């Protein structure tokens, strides 16, 4: 993931912590897939599996942060390496938050099932947005492993697709509630789920921004697409 250093031990430490981040990413990806399955099938057992993973995700985030703090204290990294370590820490935090969103989905699925209105809701309408969010996270993790700024730029552009899907779903859900007011409570739960999916895409976008920060040293948060493309030249 990184260029070679004079200290092979430093290289080993950087690669080790980067591998842990990818392991965390894989764990969180699995949470998302299971949470979406639980949503589409209204499967309470799948929702339970998502929630059972939460403690492992949280523990791994803490372990990675401890290792990063130790590396910084012992190695006194150069500017580029410090950017990498900071970005790894922020990426880890974003992955943990993706896990939080997966858990929110799982808990809400359980609530909807218990309300007895599960099958009456158009949950399948969320499939496209969920697939987009999951795909963006996978691309972000792959780009992070390769420090691929071109892939990072593609993620930043594609994030708008999830936002459009979310907006379209909200319009459909409002219409659905107006046609059948009895489903308002459960429909609001589904709206909460849609927002959780949108946030997963936002976290993938954040990771893409960290990649650009590592490679180019440019903080592209809250900047226009034109400014981002200029920073990558």
Feature roles, as predicted:
Residues 1-233:
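Cytosolic, long alpha-helical scaffolding segments
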